[in-house]
């Protein structure tokens, strides 16, 4: 009887206390649906046309990929920034360990989602393009193969 109780308690703890980053998801919204669809289409384009051709498309201003607050970014799974047309100075840098304005290691969470789950959501505080003050942001991440190397493609939205 005691063993059964301990097993039940252990199982309940696992269900309730699973990895925090895998439990995140934004409230259902048109913004969240649009970002998830955008990332899914971007991953398909990378798979179909390859990294170089896809990244050329993702950098085109006023396209479905880059307009207003909407942009795609790509990292390898070590945290090297391969694409970020909204913040081009970040390209070629490593973001592993970067924290948001509240001290959350959000970049590590993004890398973990891609590596461990293949896709998912992460929330964090980040400035909108052209601004310096952080705002709440939700990012949808999807693991992809970038010219034979594992990486991720992502985009996000700032809730209205």
What do these predicted regions represent?
Residues 2-11, 15-160:
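N-terminal membrane-sensor/transducer module of prokaryotic signaling receptors
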């Amino acid at each position: 009887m005691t063993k059964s109780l301990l097993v039940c308690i252990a199982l309940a703890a696992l269900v309730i206390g699973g990895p925090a980053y895998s439990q995140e998801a934004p409230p259902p919204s048109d913004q969240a649906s649009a970002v998830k669809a955008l990332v899914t289409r971007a991953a398909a384009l990378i798979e179909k046309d390859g990294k170089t051709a896809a990244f050329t498309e993702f950098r085109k201003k006023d396209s479905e990929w880059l307009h207003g607050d909407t942009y795609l970014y790509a990292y390898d799974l070590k945290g090297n920034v391969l694409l970020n047309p909204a913040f081009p100075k970040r390209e070629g840098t490593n973001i592993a360990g970067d924290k948001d304005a509240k001290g959350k290691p959000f970049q590590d969470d993004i890398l973990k989602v891609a590596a461990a789950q293949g896709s998912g959501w992460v929330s964090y505080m980040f400035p909108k393009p052209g601004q310096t003050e952080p705002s709440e942001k939700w990012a949808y991440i999807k693991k992809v193969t970038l010219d034979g190397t594992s990486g991720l493609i992502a985009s996000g939205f700032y809730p209205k």
